Structure formats: C-alpha cells, structure tokens
Amino acid sequence: IDGYKRIAALEQLGRDTVDAVVWPLSEAAAILLDRSLRFSEPETALEVGWLLAELQQRFGYGLEELARRFDRSVSWVWRRLALVEVLPEAIQEQVRQGQIAAQVAMKFLAPVARQSLEDCRRMADIFAQRRAEVREAGQLYAAWRQGSRAVRKRLLEAPELFFKTQRQQSQPAPAGLLR
C-alpha cells in the first residue's frame, strides 16, 4: 500500500531487494490503516473526500460504515463526499489552490450545486475573488437561498452591492440620529 518512497530511497542506495512485512489485510483495511498511521500533515477536506468516495465506490462502504471507521458523524462524511461528488472539477481546483476555503465549499457551494451548477460556478467565482470568509459567504448564501429567481440572479450579478448593504447594516447608527 505505502512504500514507494522507501523503494525509491533503496534504489538510490543501489539496493535491488526490499525487506517487507506482509499483513493479512484486505485492501480497504490496509488503506484505512495506512491513513491512521501517518504522521505527516493532515489531509485536506478534498483529499478526505476523495478517499471516502474511493472507499464507497470500490469497496461498497455506506455512510454509516465510513462514519464509524473514521470516528466521525454521518454528516461529516456526507459533507466531504459532497465536495467531490457534487462540486464541478473547476471549483474543486479552486478549493485545492486555497482560493476558496473547504468549509465554505462544503457548507454553501455544495448545496447550491445541487440546485444550479451555473449559480454554483458564479458564487464560487465571487467567493474566490473576495477570498470570502465563512461568515461573509454564509450571508450571500442565505440571501441566495431565500431569494426568488430574479433576486438570485441580481445577487450573483452584483455581489458588491449586496456586501455593501451588509456592511452598512452592521455599522451602528451615528449617535446624533438616535432618538
């Protein structure tokens, strides 16, 4: 399962044999064991989503089984699967490059993608351009979700107007205007 770095190092040392330990595990169990034994940086939400999708598709694991094996909730599994199953590749790439936070993609873009891929792409571009934080992205998503088709279109065509209005509403009124 994991050993390509060790093999490359042994080749550089001129070794043509490798000592190995074979554990009697299924491929799925070996993949999960390999993940649990890693000491490197934690995987990104997308990488976890790809792994979950692989385990679901190739090995037939259901959401509950994946949640149990990862010691997480079904909702956690479902959100990460949504990243790779629902979001278009271009948006996954924006998440991969750090232009869009994975949490923003999971919480807001995945639900939009289920309703409209075009709106999802436009919203993703807005989030990427603004480097939107979760709170700001949530405000736009909530307005989009509550709006009619015409309101949704205006939100995505002129997001700056929406964000300007949000900033104005969040600022306290000047003291002289209070009664």
Where are these regions (language model features)?
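Short, conserved phosphate/pyrophosphate- and ester-handling motifs at nucleotide-, phospho-/glycolipid
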Residues: G3
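Amphipathic, charge-rich alpha-helical segments that serve as recognition/docking helices
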Residues: A8-L87, Q92
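Amphipathic alpha-helical extensions and coiled-coil-like segments
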Residues: G49, A53-Y61, R79-R179
